[in-house]
């Protein structure tokens, strides 16, 4: 008799995706982040659901409802901080996942890569709207500043911003719609993640060497299921250390002050995971130019496959490209630091140089160095 997991219509899908899936025998821990992102998403949906049971999306009561969750709801504080810090874990995994893709040439699977970019943008939108919900000072002013960027769009900008706000400023209507979108988007992310996997399983996983591994596959279960569980436990450990020992480490103290449209905080800045993009935005003195640079800083990922000039897929055997990659990582860390600093000398200049370097590495240096490596190898 055939095993039920191979015949049952539903079990068959799970079997072919997580059990009998042929996987490369040499994928490293860098391949763990896909499953970790799945775990993050599930944690965020569950904690978010329980928070939504007690949260009110009204400007007069939103801040108090979050306080009520932390003080009066059974284990509300841990649910709230798991959700807030879970977002940080989500972005850590996202950045490492994208970094892995850049390093090992995973972008050579165009459908998987492009859906990944859409996922990244959707998660960023979700996180931004979630940050507005507690209705603290940074929530309100963050929402005001970021939505205002759309007014840089010629001709329709102002109308567009007022349409998104649902009025002439960030107010009750804005908060309500942001809550609605923040609730629905994770389920859209879930669907996109399923499509992401669907396309990945059409080609099979890449591996560190970048060489096709069809001649050497192993079953996903038990080898990679146990590896993924270990990764998930380590991530859960890190998350709970953050939640239980320093839950506000990554947050902004200004968000413990209720939103006040009449008083602007001295330094408006987003959560840490947006700082690199915020630094690029601020480094251009023109509003529209800054918005375009901000957009392009993420959308540049979509043209990475077109800029691949190397004869090899992975950077495993390309030391010069590796130097460029780690220079890019260092540059992103500098941008993240600059995004959290006030707009004054010397931070302005550092931010501008780091922004120029970011685009130069991706658009010019990496493709050029790949060609040099091809020539050195006489390929």
Swiss-Prot record:
What GO terms describe the biological role, i.e. biological process, of this protein? mitochondrial electron transport, ubiquinol to cytochrome c
Taxonomic source organism: Taxidea taxus
Tell whether Cytoplasm is among the UniProt keywords.
no
Keyword Iron belongs to the record: yes
Cysteine pairs forming cystine bridges in this chain are: none
Provide the protein name. Cytochrome b
In UniProt terms, what function does this protein have? Answer: Component of the ubiquinol-cytochrome c reductase complex (complex III or cytochrome b-c1 complex) that is part of the mitochondrial respiratory chain. The b-c1 complex mediates electron transfer from ubiquinol to cytochrome c. Contributes to the generation of a proton gradient across the mitochondrial membrane that is then used for ATP synthesis.
Q: Which InterPro entries match?
A: Cyt_b/b6_C (IPR005798), Cyt_b/b6_C_sf (IPR036150), Cyt_b/b6_N (IPR005797), Cytb/b6-like_sf (IPR027387), Cytochrome_b (IPR030689), Cytochrome_b_C_euk/bac (IPR048260), Cytochrome_b_N_euk/bac (IPR048259), Di-haem_cyt_TM (IPR016174)
Give the UniProt subcellular location, in the record's own words. Answer: Mitochondrion inner membrane
Q: Which UniProt keywords apply?
A: Electron transport, Heme, Iron, Membrane, Metal-binding, Mitochondrion, Mitochondrion inner membrane, Respiratory chain, Transmembrane, Transmembrane helix, Transport, Ubiquinone
* Primary location recorded for the protein, binned into one broad class: mitochondrion
Q: Which GO terms describe its cellular component?
A: mitochondrial inner membrane; respiratory chain complex III
Extra facts: Heme 1 (or BL or b562) is low-potential and absorbs at about 562 nm, and heme 2 (or BH or b566) is high-potential and absorbs at about 566 nm.
Which GO molecular function entries does the Swiss-Prot or TrEMBL record give?
Answer: metal ion binding; ubiquinol-cytochrome-c reductase activity
Q: Which residues bind a ubiquinone?
A: 201
TM spans (from-to) = 33-53, 77-98, 113-133, 178-198, 226-246, 288-308, 320-340, 347-367
Q: What are its cofactors?
A: heme b
Assembly and oligomerization: The cytochrome bc1 complex contains 11 subunits: 3 respiratory subunits (MT-CYB, CYC1 and UQCRFS1), 2 core proteins (UQCRC1 and UQCRC2) and 6 low-molecular weight proteins (UQCRH/QCR6, UQCRB/QCR7, UQCRQ/QCR8, UQCR10/QCR9, UQCR11/QCR10 and a cleavage product of UQCRFS1). This cytochrome bc1 complex then forms a dimer.
Q: According to Swiss-Prot or TrEMBL, what is its membrane topology?
A: Multi-pass membrane protein
Binding positions for heme b b566 per the UniProt entry: 97, 196
Give the cofactor note: Binds 2 heme b groups non-covalently.
The record's family statement is: Belongs to the cytochrome b family.
Q: Where does heme b b562 bind?
A: 83, 182
